[in-house]
């Protein structure tokens, strides 16, 4: 059985979020939370919140044991891009892309043995 949690339209660039997601993929949830707490990146608390949601979903919806959970899938997709403009010299303007992310974490119970 697997439980999933998704955070959509999170205001962080997917490239930056992927750096953190790559650290926890395939790890046990306790170890992953410890890694996230000690990673000095802006994406860490956001991903930790999604991971805690996935653990709660597994516990509540599927009666899984939180101590036996492993992160089987963890990925970041691109969300919508908010376009903004920065004024420049001589009446010009430059476009700023404020990127958003869709963060998905899937947890499964560890196989015995």
Swiss-Prot record:
User: Would you identify the family this protein belongs to, as annotated?
Assistant: Belongs to the universal ribosomal protein uL22 family.
Q: Which residues form a coiled coil?
A: none
Spell out the subunit comment: Part of the 50S ribosomal subunit.
This protein's record includes keyword Glycosyltransferase: no
Q: What does this protein do?
A: This protein binds specifically to 23S rRNA; its binding is stimulated by other ribosomal proteins, e.g. L4, L17, and L20. It is important during the early stages of 50S assembly. It makes multiple contacts with different domains of the 23S rRNA in the assembled 50S subunit and ribosome. The globular domain of the protein is located near the polypeptide exit tunnel on the outside of the subunit, while an extended beta-hairpin is found that lines the wall of the exit tunnel in the center of the 70S ribosome.
Xref: HAMAP family: Ribosomal_uL22_B (MF_01331_B)
**GO cellular component terms, semicolon-separated:** cytosolic large ribosomal subunit
**What organism does the record attribute this protein to?**
Halalkalibacterium halodurans (strain ATCC BAA-125 / DSM 18197 / FERM 7344 / JCM 9153 / C-125) (Bacillus halodurans)
Q: Fetch the PROSITE patterns from UniProt.
A: RIBOSOMAL_L22 (PS00464)
Database matches in InterPro entries: Ribosomal_uL22, Ribosomal_uL22_bac/chlpt-type, Ribosomal_uL22_bac/org-type, Ribosomal_uL22_CS, Ribosomal_uL22_sf
The encoding gene is: rplV
The record's keywords, sorted A to Z, are: Ribonucleoprotein, Ribosomal protein, RNA-binding, rRNA-binding
Q: Under what name is this protein listed?
A: Large ribosomal subunit protein uL22
A Gene Ontology molecular function term of the record: structural constituent of ribosome
- Highest taxon of the lineage: Bacteria
Upper classification of the source organism reads: Bacteria, Bacillati, Bacillota, Bacilli, Bacillales
From the UniProt record, give one GO term of the biological process aspect: translation
UniProt-listed Pfam families:
Ribosomal_L22 (PF00237)
């Amino acid at each position: 059985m697997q439980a999933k949690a998704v955070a959509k339209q999170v205001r962080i660039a997917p490239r930056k979020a992927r750096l953190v997601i790559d650290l926890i993929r395939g790890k046990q949830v306790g170890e992953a939370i410890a890694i996230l707490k000690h990673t000095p990146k802006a994406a860490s608390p956001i991903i930790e919140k999604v991971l805690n949601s996935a653990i709660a979903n597994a516990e509540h919806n599927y009666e899984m044991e939180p101590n036996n959970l492993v992160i089987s899938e963890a990925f970041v997709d691109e969300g919508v891009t908010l376009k903004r403009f920065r004024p420049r010299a001589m009446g010009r303007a430059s476009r700023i892309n404020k990127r958003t992310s869709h963060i998905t974490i899937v947890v499964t119970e560890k196989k015995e043995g």
